[in-house]
């Protein structure tokens, strides 16, 4: 770890189409090899597909999906007296969105649809309906935290 001060967090700019910072962060997560234009096209096409399929505003559907994906609790390893315990801790707001976006994009990439735009759109719609792999990931994380509730007093 660095001995110097922690680097300041850089502020992401809101995207031009939806004027939303979380959409910019989604574009950054989808981006591969620095191809931001391609990533933006994928995300915006997915949002258009969501709008056509649901008839609702794509940004609202996306925000509902993110609320259903973002974890409230997670477990962290804590070493006490020579053994490791999985200690449940609350997730900070910044980490909640980061984990939610990471799980959403990873679940989208693992899907079977033909194009990434379709995979992302379907995963967002599934998450908005409380189904899909990304929501399952959140449920598994919460289950793990619940199972290890006995070690909550080791919190730091």
From Swiss-Prot:
Gene Ontology cellular component list: small ribosomal subunit
One Gene Ontology term of the molecular function aspect: structural constituent of ribosome
Gene3D superfamilies associated with the record: Ribosomal protein S7 domain
GO process terms (BP): translation
One Pfam family cited in the UniProt record for this chain: Ribosomal_S7
Keywords noted in UniProt: Ribonucleoprotein, Ribosomal protein, RNA-binding, rRNA-binding, tRNA-binding
Record note on quaternary structure: Part of the 30S ribosomal subunit. Contacts proteins S9 and S11.
HAMAP family named among the record's database cross-references: Ribosomal_uS7_B
Function: One of the primary rRNA binding proteins, it binds directly to 16S rRNA where it nucleates assembly of the head domain of the 30S subunit. Is located at the subunit interface close to the decoding center, probably blocks exit of the E-site tRNA.
PANTHER family xref list: RIBOSOMAL PROTEIN S7
Similarity comment: Belongs to the universal ribosomal protein uS7 family.
Protein name per Swiss-Prot or TrEMBL: Small ribosomal subunit protein uS7
Species for this entry: Streptococcus pyogenes serotype M1
Gene from which this protein is expressed: rpsG
């Amino acid at each position: 770890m660095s001995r110097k001060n922690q680097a300041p967090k850089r502020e992401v700019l809101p995207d031009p189409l939806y004027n939303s910072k979380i959409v910019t962060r989604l574009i950054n997560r989808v981006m591969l090899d620095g191809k931001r234009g391609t990533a933006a096209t994928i995300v915006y096409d997915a949002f258009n597909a969501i709008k056509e399929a649901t008839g609702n505003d794509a940004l609202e559907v996306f925000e509902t999906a993110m609320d259903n994906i973002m974890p409230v609790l997670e477990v962290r390893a804590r070493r006490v007296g020579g053994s490791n315990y999985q200690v449940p801790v609350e997730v900070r707001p910044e980490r909640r969105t980061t984990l939610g976006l990471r799980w959403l994009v990873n679940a989208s990439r693992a899907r079977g649809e033909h194009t990434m735009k379709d995979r992302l759109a379907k995963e967002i719609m599934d998450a908005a309906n409380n189904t899909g792999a990304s929501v399952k990931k959140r449920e598994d994380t919460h289950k793990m935290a619940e199972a290890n509730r006995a070690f909550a007093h080791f919190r730091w």
